[in-house]
Design a protein with these regions (language model features):
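Positively charged n-region of N-terminal signal peptides that target proteins for export
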Residues: 1-5
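Bacterial N-terminal signal peptides
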Residues: 7-16
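A beta-strand edge to alpha-helix "cap/lid" segment located at domain peripheries
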Residues: 21-49, 54-149
Length: 149
């Protein structure tokens, strides 16, 4: 009976510490999901607040800075119609976080419909109370690609 009670007590302590550690991770996952929606909606005002002034964006056809990325989204040169997120992983180290999303992206690029499998790497930095995106990189992958957790 004592061993069962000890096991349950240790399990609860471990479980509660896991939830405490994952609050920031959940915030980042939600922020990443919101970002996909804002990109789809072409909501450059919200994206402008999220993207750090020195943010970089790496696509299959080039690398852009913040203002260029916002203009591409605003004008619809790339329309991120829908990102279907299949898996997400988060790692936090100090005030820096990396979010990996395994997605299928439905987009319109130069008036052509494109459906592409990506693993997207997002780098965030905690600045005051807010997370700011420093980098976003699209890596084209096979549909069987999995993120290591």
């Amino acid at each position: 009976m004592k061993s069962i009670l000890l096991f349950v007590s240790l399990s609860l302590v471990t479980l509660s510490s896991t939830f405490a550690q994952s609050a920031e991770e959940q915030t980042l996952i939600q922020l990443s999901m919101d970002k996909w929606q804002w990109m789809s909606d072409k909501d450059v005002d919200k994206l402008d607040k999220l993207f750090d002034a020195k943010a970089k964006f790496v696509h299959m056809s080039g690398t852009w800075k913040k203002d260029e990325e916002l203009d591409i989204i605003k004008t619809g040169r790339i329309w991120y119609k829908k990102a279907t997120v299949k898996d997400t992983a988060v790692e936090i180290s100090g005030n820096t976080a990396i979010v990996w999303n395994r997605i299928t992206l439905d987009a319109v690029v130069r008036e052509q419909v494109a459906v592409t499998e990506f693993t997207v790497t997002e780098v965030y930095q905690k600045q005051g109370k807010d997370w700011k995106m420093l980098a976003l990189t699209f890596s084209s992958v096979r549909d069987t690609h999995q993120i290591k957790h």
